[in-house]
Amino acid sequence: AVSTGGANPGMVSWFVKQALLNIASDMGLQFAEPTTREGWAKLMADAGVKGVHIAERDTQRAKSPKPANVFVNTWSVEGFISEALQPAELGWGTHERWIPDHARTHDTGSGAAIFLLGPGADTRVRSWCPTPGPQLGYLVTHNEAISIADHFTVREEGEEIHLGRLPSAVR
């Protein structure tokens, strides 16, 4: 099945699979490319992966400079407000034996995610992108943060996945 198959979310899920194949190969692990969810989860565990960090930075520029105190971004207004105001949500691996005091588990689903009691716009995470380097982003809810955790979780061993996003011109 293809879930939210655009560039983001979507394509990052495919990048995680390719990165895992590269890591396993570079480590000299003996494996065949997995064809099942359980196979992908086992390969992730065999490679010792405990976390996947998805970082994004909006670097698009307009032809004319942005006026002071004007917010410009590639997110739709509705999407930005929705993601910023809803509780911060992230994949939470089964290897984690605790959750933060201000976090809760979901009543339904696979158990591969938690949510925080504050909105994503109030939750900062240290992040990194290749061009700008280190950055302080926002922990925003994104489909792939949970779908990747769910897809790659071995129920005894898992991983944490979150998306740290820094909108343009927010510093």
Outline where the language-model segments fall.
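Rossmann-fold NAD(P)-binding glycine/threonine-rich loop
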Residues: 1, 15, 19-23
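General beta-strand structural signal in soluble alpha/beta enzymes
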Residues: 2-3, 54
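Active-site rim elements
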Residues: 3-5, 135
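Domain-scale recognition of functional cores that engage charged ligands
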Residues: 5-14
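C-terminal catalytic/substrate-binding lobe primarily of soluble NAD(P)-dependent oxidoreductases
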Residues: 22-171
